[in-house]
UniProtKB/Swiss-Prot annotation:
<keyword id="KW-0814">Transposable element</keyword>
<feature type="compositionally biased region" description="Polar residues">
    <location>
        <begin position="396"/>
        <end position="405"/>
    </location>
</feature>
<keyword id="KW-0695">RNA-directed DNA polymerase</keyword>
<keyword id="KW-0540">Nuclease</keyword>
<dbReference type="GO" id="GO:0003964">
    <property type="term" value="F:RNA-directed DNA polymerase activity"/>
</dbReference>
<protein>
    <recommendedName>
        <fullName>Retrovirus-related Pol polyprotein from type-1 retrotransposable element R2</fullName>
        <ecNumber>2.7.7.49</ecNumber>
    </recommendedName>
</protein>
<feature type="region of interest" description="Nucleic acid-binding endonuclease">
    <location>
        <begin position="115"/>
        <end position="445"/>
    </location>
</feature>
<keyword id="KW-0548">Nucleotidyltransferase</keyword>
<dbReference type="GO" id="GO:0004519">
    <property type="term" value="F:endonuclease activity"/>
</dbReference>
<feature type="domain" description="Reverse transcriptase">
    <location>
        <begin position="1"/>
        <end position="114"/>
    </location>
</feature>
<keyword id="KW-0255">Endonuclease</keyword>
<keyword id="KW-0808">Transferase</keyword>
<feature type="compositionally biased region" description="Basic residues">
    <location>
        <begin position="380"/>
        <end position="389"/>
    </location>
</feature>
<keyword id="KW-0378">Hydrolase</keyword>
<feature type="region of interest" description="Disordered">
    <location>
        <begin position="380"/>
        <end position="445"/>
    </location>
</feature>
């Protein structure tokens, strides 16, 4: 009779092992789960046993990667190519293996075909396997779930380029266990926010004072508190692309200022002078994929510069050169879409550069969320208002005299007055209680 007794012991040993989270995940996928396959492929297998094994494995994965219990199953069970973590779901994987094995036997062996066709234990086993595998191939089901569920929509683009999923197969050099866990939390929508569905609707507003729901997309892409961190993320990707182009021997201009004859200014991110008097104008953008796909964002980004006014201004700047316009769009959860293929071919981007850009998106996404959480925890929830992005650290604004922390910059006279306050004025709670106060009033005081 198959059981999950050994699985419980193996998972307990896994949690005790002095391994990093990515090593524990690899151990689970490459050793522990495959060891279960032989013992579970028996005539006595039931859906209840397989479901219990899946429950234990889900619990182990969530513990290793610090995932919420509300994490969608599509993140766990979808293949890495389809945007998931590649954990096999035994409840449907084992019956599908048995179904395909019985089909091969009935097709290749006449005796096995006769046994499966006649009444008896073999036919009953085949019928039970057909019921267990009624859903069909599990990977096709989870691929559809990733593409249609709200928190995972857009991850299906991981199938178009290996750079989007390389970090899950081989941990990048220099990454710590914390980096891997935070990247996995970002990919699976587990970074803590107030915009999760189980939080009451009236409490979902951004704690930085925005009139928006505090979702991961808002924090990483729109919140003014993280404005300058988003600029740093963008600039790091631009620097990596520019360094690659210079290494190829191409003259590369970063943020060239291109003026139209009527004074309109255009500042694309890169202008790469390719061979044979050809110039590629490339603008980089990190876009969230929701109702608007990354392919649509790529088209919109191209239209920003691919119009007669810019081409006329570029012709004045680089007379006699052929101008090609091709943007570069990435997803903040580490997605390199298919639409970037044209730009990657023109710039001859290798897999290492693509992977490095993906790693920048993931690590900066983690840093942006961390800075947002530190800000709201330090200053507390702010009233709703339309505030400006916070200035760089230590820099006071010209019109309000406020520092990055949001507190007013004290003038010399205010500092002097603050030093002259008495202890009672500084901390009113330290003053003496009123005479004749009752014991309850003393406690409340």
């Amino acid at each position: 009779q198959p059981s999950v007794f050994n699985l419980v012991k193996w998972l307990a040993n896994l949690h005790k092992a002095p391994l990093k989270p990515d090593q524990k995940l690899a151990m689970l996928k490459r050793h522990i789960i495959p060891k279960l396959h032989y013992g579970l492929q028996t005539p006595n297998i039931t859906g209840q046993i397989l479901s219990e094994a899946d429950r234990l494995i889900r619990k182990a994965v969530r513990r290793v990667l610090h995932l919420s219990v509300h994490t969608g199953s599509q993140f766990l069970y979808a293949a890495i190519r389809d945007g998931g973590l590649g954990i096999p779901q035994l409840r449907y994987h084992i019956p599908d293996v048995l179904r395909r094995r019985l089909e091969n036997l009935s097709r290749d062996d006449s005796l096995a075909k006769a046994m499966l066709a006649s009444a008896g234990p073999a036919a009953e086993f085949r019928q039970r396997v057909s019921v267990l595998a009624a859903r069909g191939p599990p990977q096709a089901y989870w691929r559809e779930q990733v593409a249609t569920r709200p928190f995972s929509r857009g991850l299906e683009d991981c199938a178009h380029d290996a750079a989007s999923r390389e970090w899950l197969l081989r941990t990048p050099a220099g990454w710590t266990g914390r980096d891997f866990v935070r990247a996995a939390q970002l990919r699976t929508g587990n970074l803590p926010t107030m915009g999760l569905p189980y939080i009451p609707r009236e409490r979902r507003r951004c704690r930085a004072g925005c009139e928006r729901v505090e979702s991961v997309s808002h924090i990483l892409q729109a919140c003014p508190v993280t404005h300058f961190e988003r600029i740093k993320r963008h600039d790091e990707i631009v620097r990596k692309i520019a360094a690659h182009c210079r290494k190829r021997g191409w003259t590369t201009e970063v943020e060239p200022r291109i003026y139209h004859q009527d004074g309109q200014l255009f500042i694309p991110d890169l202008a790469v002078h390719l061979a044979a008097e050809s110039i590629l104008v490339c603008d980089v953008q990190v876009c969230w994929e929701g109702h608007r796909t990354l392919a649509k964002s790529w088209q919109n980004k191209k239209l920003v510069y691919d119009h007669p006014r810019f081409r006329k201004a570029a012709a004045r700047r680089w007379a006699g050169s052929r101008i090609a316009i091709s943007p570069l769009v990435l997803g903040p959860v580490g997605v390199w879409p298919r639409s970037n293929a044209e730009t990657a071919a023109l710039l001859q981007l290798p897999k290492t550069i693509k992977g490095s850009c993906i790693q920048s998106c993931l690590k900066w996404g983690s840093s942006i969320h961390k800075i947002f959480m530190a800000s709201v925890w330090k200053h507390g929830p702010r009233p709703a208002h339309h505030h400006q992005p916070r200035p760089p650290e230590g820099q006071a604004t010209a019109n309000t005299g406020t520092l990055q922390s949001g507190r007013p910059a004290l003038s010399h006279s205010r500092k002097k007055r603050k030093r002259q306050l008495t202890p009672t004025q500084r901390a009113p709670s330290l003053a003496s209680p009123p005479a004749g106060a009752t014991p309850r009033q003393l406690i409340e005081y």
